Amino acid sequence: MSKTIVRKNESLDDALRRFKRTVSRNGTLQEYRKREFYEKPSVKRKLKSEAARKRKNKRRRY
């Protein structure tokens, strides 16, 4: 859970920008999107192996 306290003489836009930055650094939004819908374990395994294959091919190119 990210907390952002609005500082004295700080605009709301600046505070919102700081909040968005902390959320992106923590990976909160990415985690939320990953868990938004249920994935069957078989689908998780399939996606994991596809990602590994892509990484392997990418490393092989260079």
From Swiss-Prot:
GO terms for cellular component: ribonucleoprotein complex; ribosome. Keywords: Ribonucleoprotein, Ribosomal protein. HAMAP family: Ribosomal_bS21. Pfam families: Ribosomal_S21 (PF01165). This is Small ribosomal subunit protein bS21. Residues 40-52 have a biased composition (Basic and acidic residues). The keyword DNA repair does not apply. It comes from the Bacteria. Residues 40-62 are annotated as: Disordered. GO terms for biological process: translation. The keyword Ribosomal protein applies. One of its GO terms (molecular function) is structural constituent of ribosome. Belongs to the bacterial ribosomal protein bS21 family. Residues 53-62 have a biased composition (Basic residues). InterPro entries: Ribosomal_bS21 (IPR001911), Ribosomal_bS21_CS (IPR018278), Ribosomal_bS21_sf (IPR038380). Disulfide bonds: none annotated.
